[in-house]
Amino acid sequence: MSKEYLFTSESVSEGHPDKVADQVSDGVLDAILATDPQARVACETLVSTGLVVISGEITTTAHPNYREIAQEVIRRIGYDNSDIGFDYKSCAVLAAINRQSADIAQGVNEGEGLDLDQGAGDQGLMFGYACNETPSLIPLPIYYAHRIMQRQSELRKDGRLNWLRPDAKSQLTVRYVDGKPVAIDTVVVSTQHSPEVSHAQITELVIEEIIKPVLPSALMQGEVRYLINPTGRFVIGGPHGDCGLTGRKIIVDTYGGAAHHGGGAFSGKDPSKVDRSAAYAGRWVAKNIVAAGLADRCEVQVAYAIGVARPVSMMIETFGTGRITDEKIVELVQRHFDLRPKAIIQELNLLRPIYGKTAAYGHFGRDEPEFTWEATDKAAALRADAGL
């Protein structure tokens, strides 16, 4: 008997207040890494009506202009007029920055601390995931939820739908049969808009110009329910409508709820923080396992102790889809991947100003060259070593 269920994932636009905060934090990180690749950065941002607050622990030889960084990020997003609730030209930017704790630095710096290798920047557990539902080996609901939001941004910025404003959310419910996506059940889009456009106009144009051009027609053969701005009005939005904070969209950033999450956010953190670098490495490992044909679905967990280089544990789960045992896959991963922080940073070339692009529309399932953790460069070797 087949198993049928509905699964839902959501995405948010670059103008969502939490994503504004993420982009400011990663904007600071990129500005620092551009001149000081060895900097230690843990940057948190709060955005509210007319206000940006940047805080955290940063040790660097760079001299970032926090106000200019924040204003440029906000301008690029599209908050350029107080009429839409936020204006990069007039918002206040406050910065309260400390240096990284010397006790933490001792455990992370290579050649210091009890472990002379570069240790993990903190304890914690991280997950990576991949599946063969889409060409990018990312779950289908989150993949298309992101595409809807990217389409909203595209039509807003090029003026084709000039009543759109930056803040928006999407949600996609997909029907699965025996673990495979077979139909789209419900699409929810809430988008900020100018006050003169009617709800009927918004509904028609969002469905016809944003949703339908993005979603695969093969999954839309049945009756699809559309819920467009279901409150009826969304004029007040962005940081004026809701306070935004760095790290509040960790499920949007990853796999849309289709996989576990260790709890650590990404944005504003340099790659010595395993919350970020090890989660990227976990995705790299899982994607190569699926690309190699070792499994249809794969979840990888790694865990670290602060100041210790090697992971304290690694677990792989293939949900009954593996061509070989999960234990055998663990052995293959241990032979083909070095998951010490320094090795991850070197292998994935993470000491570069590449993080701004990650801060909206997902850290995974992307094809831009900066997303080195999306490479399937180990797949052939894994498959050969597995004897497949």
Swiss-Prot record:
Transmembrane segments: none annotated. Its cofactor is Mg(2+); K(+). It is found in: Cytoplasm. Catalyzes the formation of S-adenosylmethionine (AdoMet) from methionine and ATP. The overall synthetic reaction is composed of two sequential steps, AdoMet formation and the subsequent tripolyphosphate hydrolysis which occurs prior to release of AdoMet from the enzyme. This is S-adenosylmethionine synthase. The gene is metK. K(+) binds at residue 44. Mg(2+) binds at residue 18. It comes from Aromatoleum aromaticum (strain DSM 19018 / LMG 30748 / EbN1) (Azoarcus sp. (strain EbN1)). ATP binds at residues 16, 167-169, 233-234, 242, 248-249, 265, 269. GO terms for biological process: one-carbon metabolic process; S-adenosylmethionine biosynthetic process. Keywords: ATP-binding, Cytoplasm, Magnesium, Metal-binding, Nucleotide-binding, One-carbon metabolism, Potassium, Transferase.
